[in-house]
């Protein structure tokens, strides 16, 4: 698992308490790879005017409802996850050896996220077991709970602009230290890019009119996630 250095703190707490011991019981090696050891970019990417995360932007104005009219393309999953995992494996196993035999990368993308599937061949071959088995996110969570484990938290960065209102509210109410970091992060990025925001509302996160969906977004608003297919490796 790639640690983007901004992963929601309750995710790693869950991984440490439940997933790591489970892997030990199954004799499966479990690794968390720090992004900063292998990534070539952090927030600022190759284009200094376009940071890697898909922040909302008012650069071209706002719509009739006063919301940000645009959203940045998302490259953070490629730079912080895909390339980090690949460089780690090349260094550990040998680039030539991996090129010769190929690597299967299992992606934790559920069947309702099929549009994010990217079929690949060659050295890095992506597999989508949940899609192949027609497993939805709700079903996957139920499997975990039926095994006797607590409901797993959503895995995404605390500053990820792809969070819907429900996820922002969950973090604000249940992981307030992460919400505070996200508010500070928004202020930091606006020192460099004052037209960017973490939410579509285009106001400081602490003041955003976040509204619960009442269960409407129980599957998360999958449409707004990036197309790279790399958020869940």
Regions found by a protein language model. Give the residues of each.
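Nucleotide-activated chemistry modules centered on ATP-dependent adenylation/adenylyltransferase
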Residues: 1-233
